């Protein structure tokens, strides 16, 4: 980016070329972006969050290290894993969904729900034991939404998150049931 501000990067994104290899290591169990060409950024000046992407944003290597997530505060774990769940649900419902994206999306949904049930029974100790499953589920959701896309939940949550600085997973949660009911 050669010292460019975020507005310049965003405007020139299609023409930017990476100058070095890219290794991505997620530190939450939410976005799955380590396997996509996509990122969400807060455009504070505009009062919104936006998605951005270009082929050079694909990682050369992506590494999942569940132990990095052991110390996540409960709130961060909850909001980031809800983001993964919403990614998976929106991607399987997307008109762009394929058998491939549905395979990964449905598997992510199953793993996340099963994980929540385990955490409910066993607390933080159980969460740490199955953190690898949450990392994989988030990764699967990333594979699914990276191709199929997201939809109304994300479109609405970007506005809430950008204007009021609500964490992405929390704003997704706030919109999720209302959007699915309609």
Regions found by a protein language model. Give the residues of each.
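Glycine/threonine-rich beta-strand-loop-alpha-helix active-site module
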Residues: 1-66
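Amphipathic alpha-helical segments within well-ordered protein domains
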Residues: 113, 117, 157-161, 177-180
């Amino acid at each position: 980016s050669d010292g460019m501000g975020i507005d310049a990067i965003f405007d020139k994104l299609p023409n930017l070329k990476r100058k070095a290899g890219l290794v991505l290591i997620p530190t939450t169990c939410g976005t799955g972006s380590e396997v996509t060409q996509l990122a969400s950024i807060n455009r504070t000046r505009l009062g919104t969050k936006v998605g951005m992407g270009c082929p050079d944003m694909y990682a050369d290597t992506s590494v999942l290290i569940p132990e990095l997530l052991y110390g996540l505060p409960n709130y961060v774990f909850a909001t980031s894993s809800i983001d993964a769940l919403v990614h998976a649900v929106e991607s399987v419902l997307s008109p762009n969904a394929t058998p491939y994206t549905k395979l990964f999306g449905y598997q992510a949904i199953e793993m996340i729900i099963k994980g929540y049930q385990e955490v409910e029974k066993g607390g933080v100790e159980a969460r740490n034991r199955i953190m690898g499953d949450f990392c994989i589920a988030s990764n699967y959701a990333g594979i699914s939404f990276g191709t199929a896309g997201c939809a109304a939940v994300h479109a609405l949550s970007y506005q809430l998150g950008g204007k009021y600085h609500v964490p992405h997973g929390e704003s997704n949660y706030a919109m999720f049931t209302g959007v699915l009911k309609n």
